Amino acid sequence: MKKLFKNKKFVVILSAALSLLLITGLSLFYAFFLRYSTTPKGGKLKTVDLSVMPAGTPADLEYLYDLKVIDFGDGGEEYMAHPDSVLLNPGTENEIVYTVYVGGHGKGPLQVKTSSDGGKTYSSRLTSLPKSWEKSEETPTVYELQFVGGEKKWILISANPKWPGYLSGDGFNVSVSTDNCETWTEFQKFYGKDSDFPTNPIVAMSALVRLKENGAWADKWMGLFHDNKFRLYKTILTFDEDGNPNWSQPEEYLKNSVTASGKKTDQTFLAKMAKLCEVECVRSSNGQGDELMIIGRSNTKRMNSLMAYSTDEGETWTELKEAPAAVNGERHKAEYTPDGRMVMTFRSVERDGRFTWHSEGLVMWVGKYEDLKKWYDSGENSLGDYRVKLAHVYLSGQTEPAEKAGSDTGYCGVVVLSDGRIVVSSYGKFDAESGKTYIASKTVKLEDLDKLYAKLAKTGS
């Protein structure tokens, strides 16, 4: 060995090899850790904090601080999570918030409770549910479907992902209601492990948006989900002549992206580097426009949430860009309000730098669709109106609310009543004493939040 090191030729070759390894290592570090680990972008908005009611709060605003328990573990559960909600009988005097959730983390029996008074009180657990719902394997999502002829259906979707100990994922399950959620079909599986196109879905469908054809509404809906390799899929829902649901073969939609100059590009690599998932899809112009926006969770937390747009009903998408810090988070759920603004709930992710972060818990952004579009198009610091901390999620050892909060929350059901009330259902450790993770809801109106924000902006605190 000593003779080798005395050999100048060997030393030169060894030095060159080590230099090459160092350069390669630094290049890989840049490619996978620095290039895809960005500094946080976009300023922060002021936050209206509804976790603690200040002294002197006007009586008509006190309700904003009232968190309603939906299910504290009525069946003895210590952990309940991942609700979703749909509004029944919208625009009538009998509006009902229908909330479905799971008795466990992701997997477990599905439960349902309803509220007929805008989230002030909730029913007991409904008992006339499909037998197959007792063995749900993942987060449920529920949507109302409106048809061209005026007919309505409701659809509930629950994925079958590859949990630890499972050999594979097993597609996604679907139930349909045609009677205002009074009854449901049993689960029907699509794209399971024994199908021609086996899939391993997670959070199916994180979004389900109605599509247009030639500018007019069609009886088609685009559903989005991801798998355990962070491949992002779309599948198109239609119904046959007998009213049975059909889903098109899933396809990776970010392969069909286009740069600002019109050049085709594949955004799947960037999506995988960020571990983009749980994508929400929002239609412009109060849900009536011809543009779609997607925004999703950057699971590495080394980039902000990512956004893109489509003007051809999801056939192609613009390049992915980071969203502003004001909406950085996980499992975004967006709805329009009667005044044309948008509310978006999510699990807060506050990035302190390239590699560190904390959460402020359960957050709702208030702004306009156009605010986020301006940010995307020009980098203009268009961040929206303000944020709302809906409730405090307690970290271990916390005895009172603070800025930093638990991150095991979000996955909200969000409905907007005809009078403008917004009912948000979520899950979390909402008290310091019980140690339980349970389902709760908060009801707010933007006109009342605006009053609190005006006071906040005036005092600067």
Language-model regions, residue ranges each:
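Compositionally biased, intrinsically disordered low-complexity segments
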Residues: 15-16, 26, 285
